[in-house]
């Protein structure tokens, strides 16, 4: 499902622990790290997609997390030209994302990245809240900055 402007609707997931750290996941067979994210299917709400992607990518269920906040609007990034599939119709030039800030309320041993036949990640770790800004691929950096900045006050006020 791609919107008329060429952006694919997507959810981004910032999962925090009680220490305020965030889950940082390594793409399978790559030295590339990112937050879990994934597309919103037709007839799915962003929250529905959040829970589906959370389960597919990190093995967590609805009862394992608490939603602390969600970005107010869509945050967009364009794909680098080398990643645009120019022969696909409709043409997808990037992603538009709703970002969710979650708190893990279950034990971290519940995090599993091998529950699907095609896992997206092969490792993870807890990192400081702002660490991802210096590590994520360049074309996603501004969206990460905007999401982290908008959601940070909710992390600090959660107690």
UniProtKB/Swiss-Prot annotation:
Annotated GO CC locations: cytoplasm
Cofactor(s) the protein requires to work: a divalent metal cation
EC number: 3.6.1.-
Motif Nudix box: chain residues: 38-59
Transmembrane domains' residue ranges: none
Keyword Hydrolase on entry: yes
GO molecular function: mRNA 5'-diphosphatase activity
Key words, A-Z: Hydrolase
Domain of life (superkingdom): Bacteria
Keyword Hydrolase: yes
GO BP term, pick one: mRNA catabolic process
CDD domains hit by this protein: NUDIX_Ap4A_hydrolase_plant_like
Known function: Accelerates the degradation of transcripts by removing pyrophosphate from the 5'-end of triphosphorylated RNA, leading to a more labile monophosphorylated state that can stimulate subsequent ribonuclease cleavage.
Alphabetized PANTHER family for the sequence: M7GPPPN-MRNA HYDROLASE
HAMAP family: Nudix_RppH
Record-given protein name: RNA pyrophosphohydrolase
């Amino acid at each position: 499902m791609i919107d008329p402007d060429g952006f694919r609707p997507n959810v981004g997931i910032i999962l925090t622990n009680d220490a305020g750290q965030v889950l940082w996941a390594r793409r399978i067979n790559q030295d590339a790290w990112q937050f879990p994210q994934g597309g919103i299917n037709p007839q799915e709400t962003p929250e529905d997609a959040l829970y589906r992607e959370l389960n597919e990518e990190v093995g967590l269920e609805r009862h394992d997390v608490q939603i602390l906040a969600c970005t107010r609007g869509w945050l967009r990034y364009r794909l680098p030209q080398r990643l645009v599939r120019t022969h696909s119709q409709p043409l997808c030039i990037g992603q538009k994302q709703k970002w969710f800030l979650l708190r893990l309320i279950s034990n971290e041993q519940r995090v599993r990245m091998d529950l699907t036949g095609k896992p997206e990640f092969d490792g993870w770790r807890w990192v400081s809240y702002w660490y991802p800004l210096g590590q994520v691929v360049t074309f996603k950096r501004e969206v990460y900055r905007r999401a982290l900045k908008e959601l940070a006050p909710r992390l600090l006020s959660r107690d």
